[in-house]
């Protein structure tokens, strides 16, 4: 009998082993869809991004006009831009849900996969930040100024680092040029990291909602999960297209319709919605260096997740106390997101500080304690 090409060809064999004949736990739920959705988001963003880059000019005098030109004069330019801008929002929705799934079901115990995932998150955040600066509107300019300025909080070398990043003494043409370079480069870096992420995942195989070894009950990825993923794609593209076609500017800042002006500061400088929770951490500490450390810690704490796991059970499926904490953490992050969008005044300052404190308390103290307590409860 002739050998099956997809199983013998050196390249097709790799695709076959990771997308077609991949042994997959039969009981993985819809929460396992977000990985493939992130892949689709990345592909969409790279394609729309390439088309936008073809019409973009990375120069402070022309950037704003070139984006306006793309929307007005380029065939379907408005659609490409709207898909790219709102696609970023969906990218973040998917990655946050993907991370939430990982925390809930103990997927972080696959340490290499988890760590590459956290690095992917940080790279994605950097990409989104530099991308937001490119249209060169008011919020683009002031967002870049405020966030890059945070590096000046680093003792001794901070100011030098900031001026080196700016390529001058303020955010100007060199800054825009290098941000465009980075925004073009980073998605391809994300692609490479994604391959590493998947390589580590396929070493161990997927986790499942019960958190138990599922080797005795695996089914091929195709057709079962390829079909389930296709449903996921449709359910994501529907709201994305709805948003991009009906209210493309819903999630944007009206301030960005004004070209960047270094002489006029907007009344409220705030990032896109998907960074508001991090902005909440930053603002809840009155000291500059303290705020920067809180912001960094809020992300880097994810690296500690495997070390803070004290339960004998992997997932939270049968751990009601941990579930309660998990959903409290989720609500807490939503509160931080809301606070981040509000002006710095009473009562938002104290709410932000309490929410920040709660976030770290839950992750560093309450999760491990609850895990240990539930272990004890198993004995009775």
UniProtKB/Swiss-Prot annotation:
UniProt binding sites for heme b b566:
98, 197
Cofactor dependency: heme b
Task: Note the InterPro entries from the entry.
Answer: Cyt_b/b6_C (IPR005798), Cyt_b/b6_C_sf (IPR036150), Cyt_b/b6_N (IPR005797), Cytb/b6-like_sf (IPR027387), Cytochrome_b (IPR030689), Cytochrome_b_C_euk/bac (IPR048260), Cytochrome_b_N_euk/bac (IPR048259), Di-haem_cyt_TM (IPR016174)
Q: Name one GO molecular function term.
A: metal ion binding
Q: Which GO terms describe its biological process?
A: mitochondrial electron transport, ubiquinol to cytochrome c
Per UniProt, a ubiquinone binds at 202
What is annotated about its quaternary structure and interactions? Answer: The cytochrome bc1 complex contains 11 subunits: 3 respiratory subunits (MT-CYB, CYC1 and UQCRFS1), 2 core proteins (UQCRC1 and UQCRC2) and 6 low-molecular weight proteins (UQCRH/QCR6, UQCRB/QCR7, UQCRQ/QCR8, UQCR10/QCR9, UQCR11/QCR10 and a cleavage product of UQCRFS1). This cytochrome bc1 complex then forms a dimer.
What does the similarity note say? Belongs to the cytochrome b family.
Q: What this chain does, per the record?
A: Component of the ubiquinol-cytochrome c reductase complex (complex III or cytochrome b-c1 complex) that is part of the mitochondrial respiratory chain. The b-c1 complex mediates electron transfer from ubiquinol to cytochrome c. Contributes to the generation of a proton gradient across the mitochondrial membrane that is then used for ATP synthesis.
Question: What name is this protein filed under?
Answer: Cytochrome b
Species classification: Eukaryota, Metazoa, Chordata, Craniata, Vertebrata
Which gene produces this protein? MT-CYB
């Amino acid at each position: 009998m002739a050998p099956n090409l997809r199983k013998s060809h050196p390249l097709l064999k790799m695709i076959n082993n990771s997308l077609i004949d991949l042994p997959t736990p039969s009981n993985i739920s819809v929460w396992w869809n977000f990985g493939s959705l992130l892949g689709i988001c990345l592909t969409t963003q790279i394609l729309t991004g390439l088309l936008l880059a073809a019409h973009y000019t990375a120069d402070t005098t022309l950037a704003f006009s070139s984006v306006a030109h793309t929307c007005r004069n380029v065939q379907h330019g408005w659609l490409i831009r709207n898909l790219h801008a709102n696609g970023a929002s969906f990218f973040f929705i998917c990655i946050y849900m993907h991370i939430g799934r990982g925390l809930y079901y103990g997927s972080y115990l696959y340490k290499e996969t988890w760590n590459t995932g956290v690095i992917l998150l940080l790279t994605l955040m950097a990409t989104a930040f530099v991308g937001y600066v490119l249209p060169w509107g008011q919020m683009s300019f002031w967002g870049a100024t405020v966030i890059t300025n945070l590096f000046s909080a680093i003792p001794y070398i901070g100011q030098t680092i900031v001026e080196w990043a700016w390529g001058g003494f303020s955010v100007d043409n060199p800054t825009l040029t290098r941000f465009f370079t980075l925004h073009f480069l980073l998605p391809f870096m994300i692609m490479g990291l994604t391959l590493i992420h998947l390589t580590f995942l396929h070493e161990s195989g997927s986790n499942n909602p019960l958190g138990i070894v599922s080797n005795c009950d695996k089914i091929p990825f195709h057709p079962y999960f390829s079909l389930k993923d296709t449903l996921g794609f449709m359910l994501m593209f529907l709201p994305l297209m709805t948003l991009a076609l009906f209210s493309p500017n819903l999630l944007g800042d009206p301030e960005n319709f004004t070209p960047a002006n270094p002489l006029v500061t907007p009344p409220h400088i705030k990032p896109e919605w998907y960074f508001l929770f991090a902005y909440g951490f930053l603002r809840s500490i009155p000291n500059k260096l303290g705020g920067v450390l809180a912001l960094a810690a809020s992300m880097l704490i994810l690296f500690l997740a495997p070390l803070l796991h004290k339960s004998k059970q992997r997932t939270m499926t049968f751990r009601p106390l941990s579930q309660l904490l998990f959903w409290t953490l989720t609500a807490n992050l939503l509160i931080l997101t809301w606070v981040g969008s509000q002006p710095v005044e009473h009562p938002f300052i104290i709410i932000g500080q309490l929410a920040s404190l709660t976030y770290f308390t839950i992750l560093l103290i309450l999760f491990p304690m609850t895990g240990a307590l539930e272990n004890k409860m198993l004995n009775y």
